[in-house]
Amino acid sequence: MSREGIRRRPKARAGLTGGGTATLPRVEDTLTLGSRLGEQLCAGDVVVLSGPLGAGKTVLAKGIAMAMDVEGPITSPTFVLARMHRPRRPGTPAMVHVDVYRLLDHNSADLLSELDSLDLDTDLEDAVVVVEWGEGLAERLSQRHLDVRLERVSHSDTRIATWSWGRS
């Protein structure tokens, strides 16, 4: 059951439907990309962030949260697995920020069980779910999801981001 009053936009999104690539030389550029992506998200969307340690996944999640105007500091939820960030404005979705990094040593059945125990699917109608390290798993939460891959350029602070909409 969804909360009344949450605005839902049509699933077609101008500018993001085909995906894209961006070079991000500064942290501010990663925040800006996150904000740009965040402006296009609506309740029910799942965003899967992947890339090596230090690639900028949490920074991108901060940018998404800035655009969504949700409460609380956005920090990596590695040790608590998931954090709910409530919307500051009525009629806008919450953001659930998930990080499954510490579960990666588990076998895939255990990992799916842990992910399932978070009951994220119950939040999908009223929230945008952003999952760090969820590649190959989080996509199962929604038929339509945004995949964002961040890579670090060797011997540089520059990151390369690639994103596309996927279907499960």
Swiss-Prot record:
One of its GO terms (cellular component) is cytoplasm. Keywords: ATP-binding, Cytoplasm, Magnesium, Metal-binding, Nucleotide-binding, tRNA processing. SUPFAM superfamilies: P-loop containing nucleoside triphosphate hydrolases. Pfam families: TsaE. Its main location: cytoplasm. Mg(2+) binds at residues 58, 132. ATP binds at residues 54-59. The keyword Magnesium applies. Residues 1-21 are annotated as: Disordered. It is found in: Cytoplasm. The keyword Magnesium applies. GO terms for biological process: tRNA threonylcarbamoyladenosine modification. Belongs to the TsaE family. Required for the formation of a threonylcarbamoyl group on adenosine at position 37 (t(6)A37) in tRNAs that read codons beginning with adenine. Is involved in the transfer of the threonylcarbamoyl moiety of threonylcarbamoyl-AMP (TC-AMP) to the N6 group of A37, together with TsaD and TsaB. TsaE seems to play an indirect role in the t(6)A biosynthesis pathway, possibly in regulating the core enzymatic function of TsaD. This is tRNA threonylcarbamoyladenosine biosynthesis protein TsaE.
